[in-house]
Curated annotation (Swiss-Prot):
The lineage of its organism: Archaea, Nanobdellota, Candidatus Nanoarchaeia, Nanoarchaeales, Nanoarchaeaceae. The gene is eif2b. This is Translation initiation factor 2 subunit beta. It comes from Nanoarchaeum equitans (strain Kin4-M). eIF-2 functions in the early steps of protein synthesis by forming a ternary complex with GTP and initiator tRNA. Belongs to the eIF-2-beta/eIF-5 family. Gene3D superfamilies: 3.30.30.170. Keywords: Initiation factor, Protein biosynthesis.
Length: 139
């Protein structure tokens, strides 16, 4: 039985696609636990989220601050947002952060690290496919 190049390429692509789907299913970032105190929103498991994403908590806090137009403070394991923010908004902003700063734009896997080159210039280095991609977001 002979295969041509394109049939083999298509078979390999389909198998790789299935593997990527399985890997994406196994990766579930923690759900933010939120408390409201007066006019403040507190993400109580913020450090746990940052550790799971393998990102510096200061970068995540800066992202939230810029996106929500409000001051944020890291205190212990929590992030304090000086504004009342709904759970849906926080979840949406966390998903945006993950898509911009965590997921590899080439292979769509989360096995990455964030590298800072120069002032405010970030790259995502993927441990799965080996690519380095610039982050198209200015903190």
């Amino acid at each position: 039985m002979e295969y041509n190049y394109f049939e083999l390429l298509e078979r390999a692509y389909q198998k790789l696609k299935d593997v990527i789907k399985q890997e994406q299913i196994r990766w579930n970032p923690p759900i933010p636990h939120i408390e409201y105190v007066k006019n403040r929103t507190i993400i109580t498991n913020f450090k746990q989220i940052a550790n799971y994403l393998n990102r510096d908590p200061k970068i995540i806090a800066k992202f939230f601050s810029k996106e929500l137009f409000v001051q944020t403070i890291i205190e212990g394991n929590s992030l304090i947002i000086n504004k009342r923010v709904s759970y849906e908004t926080i979840k949406k902003k966390l998903d945006e952060f993950i898509n911009i700063f965590v997921i590899c734009p080439v292979c769509k896997r989360p096995d990455t690290e964030l590298i800072e080159r120069g002032r405010k210039i970030y790259y995502i280095k993927c441990h799965a496919c080996g690519s380095e991609s610039p982050v198209n977001y200015e903190l």
